[in-house]
Amino acid sequence: MQNAKRKMQNCQGFSLLELMIAMFILIILLSVALPTYQYTVQHARETVLKENIRQIENAIDQYAADKGKLPQSIDELVEAKYLREKPVDPITEKTEWDQVMGDDAFSSEGGQGLVDVKSLAEGEDSDGKPYKDY
Protein backbone atom coordinates (compact mmCIF):
# COMPACT_ATOMS: atom_id res chain seq x y z
CA MET A 1 0.00 0.00 0.00
CA GLN A 2 2.78 2.41 0.91
CA ASN A 3 4.58 1.35 -2.24
CA ALA A 4 1.56 2.41 -4.32
CA LYS A 5 1.41 5.81 -2.56
CA ARG A 6 5.09 6.37 -3.23
CA LYS A 7 4.57 5.63 -6.94
CA MET A 8 1.65 8.09 -7.06
CA GLN A 9 3.78 10.83 -5.50
CA ASN A 10 6.49 10.31 -8.13
CA CYS A 11 3.94 10.47 -11.00
CA GLN A 12 2.97 14.10 -10.79
CA GLY A 13 1.58 15.86 -13.88
CA PHE A 14 2.44 19.26 -15.31
CA SER A 15 1.58 22.25 -13.21
CA LEU A 16 -0.75 24.93 -14.54
CA LEU A 17 2.18 27.35 -14.78
CA GLU A 18 4.19 24.93 -16.94
CA LEU A 19 1.23 24.45 -19.29
CA MET A 20 0.69 28.21 -19.55
CA ILE A 21 4.37 28.77 -20.38
CA ALA A 22 4.24 26.08 -23.07
CA MET A 23 1.09 27.65 -24.56
CA PHE A 24 2.71 31.10 -24.50
CA ILE A 25 5.75 29.78 -26.38
CA LEU A 26 3.48 28.12 -28.97
CA ILE A 27 1.54 31.35 -29.48
CA ILE A 28 4.76 33.30 -30.04
CA LEU A 29 6.00 30.73 -32.56
CA LEU A 30 2.68 30.77 -34.43
CA SER A 31 2.59 34.57 -34.50
CA VAL A 32 5.99 34.52 -36.23
CA ALA A 33 5.28 31.61 -38.59
CA LEU A 34 1.77 32.54 -39.76
CA PRO A 35 2.64 35.83 -41.54
CA THR A 36 5.59 34.13 -43.23
CA TYR A 37 3.33 31.32 -44.41
CA GLN A 38 0.70 33.77 -45.68
CA TYR A 39 3.34 35.79 -47.56
CA THR A 40 4.72 32.61 -49.14
CA VAL A 41 1.26 31.50 -50.29
CA GLN A 42 0.50 34.96 -51.73
CA HIS A 43 3.86 35.10 -53.52
CA ALA A 44 3.21 31.63 -55.00
CA ARG A 45 -0.18 32.77 -56.33
CA GLU A 46 1.42 35.82 -57.94
CA THR A 47 4.09 33.63 -59.56
CA VAL A 48 1.42 31.28 -60.95
CA LEU A 49 -0.56 34.27 -62.27
CA LYS A 50 2.49 35.59 -64.14
CA GLU A 51 3.21 32.13 -65.56
CA ASN A 52 -0.40 31.59 -66.70
CA ILE A 53 -0.42 34.97 -68.47
CA ARG A 54 2.92 34.13 -70.11
CA GLN A 55 1.54 30.78 -71.35
CA ILE A 56 -1.53 32.46 -72.85
CA GLU A 57 0.62 35.11 -74.55
CA ASN A 58 2.92 32.42 -75.97
CA ALA A 59 -0.12 30.51 -77.25
CA ILE A 60 -1.43 33.69 -78.93
CA ASP A 61 1.94 34.23 -80.64
CA GLN A 62 2.19 30.59 -81.76
CA TYR A 63 -1.40 30.60 -83.05
CA ALA A 64 -0.74 33.80 -85.02
CA ALA A 65 2.47 32.38 -86.50
CA ASP A 66 0.78 29.12 -87.52
CA LYS A 67 -2.60 30.43 -88.73
CA GLY A 68 -1.64 33.87 -90.03
CA LYS A 69 -4.22 35.60 -87.86
CA LEU A 70 -4.92 36.31 -84.21
CA PRO A 71 -7.33 34.15 -82.21
CA GLN A 72 -10.66 35.64 -81.20
CA SER A 73 -10.62 34.30 -77.64
CA ILE A 74 -8.81 32.09 -75.16
CA ASP A 75 -11.44 29.43 -75.87
CA GLU A 76 -10.29 29.37 -79.49
CA LEU A 77 -6.73 28.67 -78.29
CA VAL A 78 -8.04 25.74 -76.24
CA GLU A 79 -10.13 24.38 -79.13
CA ALA A 80 -7.12 24.60 -81.48
CA LYS A 81 -5.00 22.76 -78.84
CA TYR A 82 -2.59 25.64 -78.23
CA LEU A 83 -3.62 25.42 -74.57
CA ARG A 84 -4.65 22.23 -72.78
CA GLU A 85 -7.32 24.06 -70.83
CA LYS A 86 -8.33 27.58 -69.97
CA PRO A 87 -5.89 28.65 -67.24
CA VAL A 88 -7.18 29.58 -63.80
CA ASP A 89 -6.41 33.01 -62.39
CA PRO A 90 -5.02 31.98 -58.97
CA ILE A 91 -6.01 35.29 -57.39
CA THR A 92 -9.70 35.18 -58.36
CA GLU A 93 -9.71 31.35 -58.61
CA LYS A 94 -11.74 31.61 -61.84
CA THR A 95 -11.01 30.96 -65.51
CA GLU A 96 -12.24 34.41 -66.50
CA TRP A 97 -9.72 36.87 -67.96
CA ASP A 98 -9.81 40.39 -69.37
CA GLN A 99 -9.26 39.61 -73.04
CA VAL A 100 -7.67 42.60 -74.76
CA MET A 101 -8.62 42.86 -78.42
CA GLY A 102 -6.55 44.79 -80.93
CA ASP A 103 -5.81 45.21 -84.62
CA ASP A 104 -4.74 41.99 -86.30
CA ALA A 105 -1.45 42.82 -88.00
CA PHE A 106 -0.95 39.14 -88.90
CA SER A 107 -4.05 38.89 -91.08
CA SER A 108 -4.15 40.19 -94.64
CA GLU A 109 -7.84 40.92 -94.07
CA GLY A 110 -7.19 43.08 -91.00
CA GLY A 111 -9.80 43.02 -88.29
CA GLN A 112 -9.52 42.47 -84.58
CA GLY A 113 -8.03 39.64 -82.57
CA LEU A 114 -6.89 38.69 -79.10
CA VAL A 115 -3.61 40.50 -78.43
CA ASP A 116 -3.26 40.26 -74.65
CA VAL A 117 -4.87 39.03 -71.44
CA LYS A 118 -5.09 40.69 -68.05
CA SER A 119 -6.19 39.47 -64.65
CA LEU A 120 -9.62 40.50 -63.41
CA ALA A 121 -8.35 40.49 -59.82
CA GLU A 122 -8.80 43.64 -57.77
CA GLY A 123 -6.00 45.03 -55.66
CA GLU A 124 -2.23 44.89 -55.77
CA ASP A 125 0.44 42.26 -55.41
CA SER A 126 2.96 42.09 -52.57
CA ASP A 127 5.17 44.63 -54.40
CA GLY A 128 2.34 47.15 -54.83
CA LYS A 129 1.78 46.46 -58.54
CA PRO A 130 -1.91 46.20 -59.57
CA TYR A 131 -2.88 42.73 -60.78
CA LYS A 132 -4.47 44.34 -63.83
CA ASP A 133 -1.00 45.52 -64.93
CA TYR A 134 0.47 42.02 -65.17
Labelled PLM ranges:
Residues 1-12:
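N-terminal leader/signal peptides at the extreme start of proteins
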Residues 11-37:
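N-terminal single-pass transmembrane signal-anchor helix
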Residues 27, 34-53:
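Aliphatic-rich helix starts adjacent to a transmembrane/signal segment
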Residues 54-134:
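Low-complexity, acidic interaction segments enriched in glycine
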